[in-house]
Amino acid sequence: ERVLPLEDRDCATVVERAFKKRGVDVFTGVQLEKAEVHKQGVHLTFKDSKGVTHQLDVEKVLSAVGRAPNTEDLGLDRGGVITERGFIVVDEHLRTNVKGIYAIGDCAGHQLLAHKAAHEGIVCVERIAGQGHGGIDYRNVPNCTYCQPEVASVGVTEEQAKEAGMDFQVGKFPWAGIGRAVAAGHVDGFIKVIRDRRY
């Protein structure tokens, strides 16, 4: 259990360390038991990942527990389109199980990102026009997390490379080695490259 569970473990470590350095208390794997709104803010009662109960008074609460697809009123069941947890199931060419029906964007799952949806739209229209040349490899969709320090990634994480049994090398360069980062006073972080040894 860590902050940024979908990002590379090294990234999560740097972000958590930066948060703690700024005095941010970090709790992961918590289960919220009660949130009581008061004039001064919100009183929270929650259990941490070890089952220990904590109470915390905060000004505001931001709940970031994911997003749900908005596909309920599309009549997908009447058309026989298969969904999984509300997302429309598609192949690498954005085709559903029903001939002639495609799906792109958030309703089709994967990363819920605007630039991913735009690319899916292009791939889908090319396929419909008979000019499709390939599908989408979701490993090549860039991601970012807006925090300080910022996190950006594309491709597989080190953990994913290990799980896939890839023969890979890791290259890592400290952010503090970049003059602009030093000049800006933002030296936390690194650049990390996971390279398949075949290439």
Which role fits each region the language model picked out?
Residues 1-54, 111-118, 124-160:
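Rossmann-like dinucleotide-binding cores of NAD(P)H-dependent redox enzymes
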Residues 46-51, 92, 195-197:
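Short acidic, glycine-rich loop/turn motifs
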Residues 106-113, 147, 176-184:
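Glycine-rich phosphate/pyrophosphate-binding beta-alpha loops
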Residues 25-27, 102, 169-171:
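General small-molecule cofactor/ligand-binding pocket signal
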